[in-house]
C-alpha cells in the first residue's frame, strides 16, 4: 500500500511540476512497475521519446557511499533507448520517503549520460552520501516503447552495487 501511495504521489508531483525539474508530460496516466521502480509517462505501444522515471530505494549495500550512477536496462529486443543531453535528465533524492524530491541536482552534477540501443547509464558527481531508505529519482526522456503491449521486466542498478527489477506496462 505504501508503494502505491508513493507512486501516486510521484505521479501528482510529475504532473504538477510544470517547467521545474521532473516536469509532467502529456495527459497519459503513468504506467507503474512492481515496487515502483520505473514509471512511463506514456504507456502506449510504439510511443517514442517517452519520459521514464526511475525511483530506486537505496539499501544497505550502497548506504554510506556517494551517489555516483544509475543504470537502467530494458529488454533489448523490445525497447529502444535514444541519447539524451545532460540538461534533459532530471535528478533528485527523496530523503524521507514521502514521495517528494528533497534534494535536486542539475546538469552540472552529471559527468556522463551513456546509452546503447537498450539501456542508459547516468554518471554523477553529486557529493550526496546515500542512506538506506533514500529514494533516488532519475527521469530519462528518450525511451521508445515496444510495438507489442505487455509487461516488460526492466533492471535498474544504483552505483553498480544494488540491482532491482521492475515491470513496465505497455498498453
Regions found by a protein language model. Give the residues of each.
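Short, conserved beta-strand segments of beta-strand-rich sandwich/propeller modules, principally
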Residues: 11, 137, 151-153
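Low-complexity, serine/threonine/proline/glycine-rich extracellular segments that form mucin-like
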Residues: 33-95
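Short, ordered beta-strand-loop transition motifs
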Residues: 44-49, 105-121
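Acidic, glycine-anchored loop motifs typical of Ca2+
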Residues: 91-103, 115
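Low-complexity, intrinsically disordered segments enriched in Ser/Thr together with acidic residues
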Residues: 119-149
Amino acid at each position: 500500500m505504501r508503494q502505491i501511495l508513493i507512486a501516486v504521489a510521484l505521479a501528482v508531483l510529475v504532473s504538477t511540476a510544470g517547467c521545474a525539474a521532473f516536469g509532467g508530460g502529456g495527459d497519459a496516466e503513468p504506467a507503474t512497475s512492481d515496487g515502483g521502480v520505473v514509471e512511463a509517462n506514456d504507456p502506449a505501444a510504439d510511443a517514442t521519446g517517452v519520459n521514464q522515471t526511475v525511483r530506486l530505494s537505496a539499501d544497505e549495500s550502497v548506504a554510506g557511499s556517494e551517489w555516483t550512477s544509475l543504470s537502467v536496462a530494458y529488454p533489448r529486443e523490445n525497447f529502444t533507448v535514444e541519447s539524451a543531453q545532460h540538461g534533459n535528465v532530471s535528478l533528485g533524492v527523496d530523503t524521507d520517503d514521502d514521495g517528494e524530491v528533497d534534494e535536486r541536482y542539475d546538469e552540472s552534477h552529471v559527468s556522463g549520460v551513456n546509452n546503447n540501443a537498450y539501456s542508459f547509464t547516468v554518471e554523477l558527481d553529486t557529493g550526496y552520501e546515500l542512506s538506506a531508505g533514500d529514494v533516488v529519482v532519475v527521469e530519462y526522456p528518450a525511451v521508445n516503447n515496444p510495438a507489442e503491449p505487455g509487461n516488460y521486466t526492466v533492471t535498474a542498478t544504483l552505483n553498480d552495487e544494488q540491482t532491482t527489477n521492475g515491470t513496465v506496462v505497455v498498453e
